[in-house]
């Protein structure tokens, strides 16, 4: 079964947030004091999240990414992931994490059926990492990556949000990681999650990122897979790994968008930058799975052709990336 939106795009990818809480305070994601924590009763139970995931797979979703906040801070996450991994028809279960809890949890996550990890890492320099995350320790993340490798995970995808004057001087350092390691590094254009002034000054366009790398290395394009995300992928000639750029600001990828999102409060969103949301809670009050499936079809049916953000403007309401799931 295929899930097709009104613009002919095949939707096969669900980003499912399990919590708004995080053990970091990254500057591009939330204010220094953090975000107001949602009440326990506002967060969907694991049972309801499982029902949403199962309904999504039933109508054509093949890949589920578990996000937060930081998903690993929610108690009971490992048994929940094992249930998701066992859903018949699901091809990929992946998880995005900041890596801080991987030293203790990587082996259990692998045993639960998580197939791959995306790790948010914005600097390889301890002082810069602390400045961006405000409270994070770089070595913990590096230890987490090592623990994931020891647990048998494939090489991770490392996500770097590039910010001019903050960490853009490390683009070449991150690119070099892929030469000897079969990992993937994705450079993400800085995107405004709030109505901040002069955010454009922080954005390094994807073209500039690639030009910086190309100044030292020859890049070859890499073909994308069926459930791939929005990055344009390349390989340094002869390298073991790959790199990519995600250009939400300078060159939207809406024509190839294959995803929907569900927040930890049960709001379904067909676009990260859309102000529209669809509350799934009323459809969780019945035990009839068809009703929930039709609700998910409805949000796909109103998926916009493209978002309203560009390098000149950001036509969306302020939001917390931690609450919406990225």
Swiss-Prot record:
The keyword S-adenosyl-L-methionine applies. [4Fe-4S] cluster 2 binds at residues 254, 257, 271. Pfam families: Fer4_12, Mob_synth_C, Radical_SAM. PROSITE patterns: MOAA_NIFB_PQQE, RADICAL_SAM. Pathway: Cofactor biosynthesis; molybdopterin biosynthesis. [4Fe-4S] cluster 1 binds at residues 22, 26, 29. Its EC number is 4.1.99.22. Keywords: 4Fe-4S, GTP-binding, Iron, Iron-sulfur, Lyase, Metal-binding, Molybdenum cofactor biosynthesis, Nucleotide-binding, S-adenosyl-L-methionine. S-adenosyl-L-methionine binds at residues 28, 69, 120, 191. GO terms for molecular function: 4 iron, 4 sulfur cluster binding; cyclic pyranopterin monophosphate synthase activity; GTP 3',8'-cyclase activity; GTP binding; metal ion binding; S-adenosyl-L-methionine binding. It comes from the Bacteria. HAMAP family: MoaA_B (MF_01225_B). This is GTP 3',8-cyclase. It comes from Geobacter sulfurreducens (strain ATCC 51573 / DSM 12127 / PCA).
């Amino acid at each position: 079964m295929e899930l097709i939106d009104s613009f002919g795009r095949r939707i096969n990818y669900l980003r499912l947030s399990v919590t708004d809480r995080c053990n970091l305070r990254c500057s591009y994601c939330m204010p220094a004091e953090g975000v107001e924590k949602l009440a326990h009763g506002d967060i969907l139970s694991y049972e309801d999240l499982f029902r949403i995931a199962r309904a999504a797979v039933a109508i054509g979703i093949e890949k589920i990414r578990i996000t937060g906040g930081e998903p690993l801070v929610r108690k009971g996450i490992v048994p929940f992931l094992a249930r998701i991994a066992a859903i018949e028809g699901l091809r990929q279960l992946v998880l995005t994490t900041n890596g801080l809890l991987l030293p203790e949890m990587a082996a259990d996550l692998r045993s639960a059926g998580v197939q791959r990890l995306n790790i948010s890492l914005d600097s390889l320099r301890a002082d810069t990492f602390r400045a961006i995350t405000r409270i994070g320790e770089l070595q913990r993340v590096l230890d987490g990556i090592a623990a994931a490798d020891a647990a048998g995970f494939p090489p991770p995808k490392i996500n770097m949000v590039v910010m001019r004057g903050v960490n853009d001087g490390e683009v070449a350092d991150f690119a070099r990681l892929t030469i000897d390691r079969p990992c993937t590094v994705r450079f993400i254009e800085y995107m405004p999650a709030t109505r901040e002034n002069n955010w454009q000054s922080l954005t390094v366009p994807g073209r500039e990122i690639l030009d910086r790398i190309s100044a030292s290395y020859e890049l070859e394009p890499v073909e994308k897979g069926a459930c791939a995300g929005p990055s344009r992928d390349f390989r340094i000639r002869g390298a073991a790994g790959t790199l990519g750029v995600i250009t939400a600001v300078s060159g939207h990828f809406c024509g190839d968008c294959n995803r929907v999102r569900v927040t930890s409060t049960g709001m379904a969103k067909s676009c990260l930058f859309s102000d529209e949301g669809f509350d799934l809670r009323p459809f969780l009050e019945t035990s009839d799975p068809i009703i929930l499936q039709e609700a998910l079809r409805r949000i796909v049916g109103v998926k916009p052709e493209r978002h309203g953000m560009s390098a000149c403007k950001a036509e969306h309401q302020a939001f917390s990336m931690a609450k919406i799931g990225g």
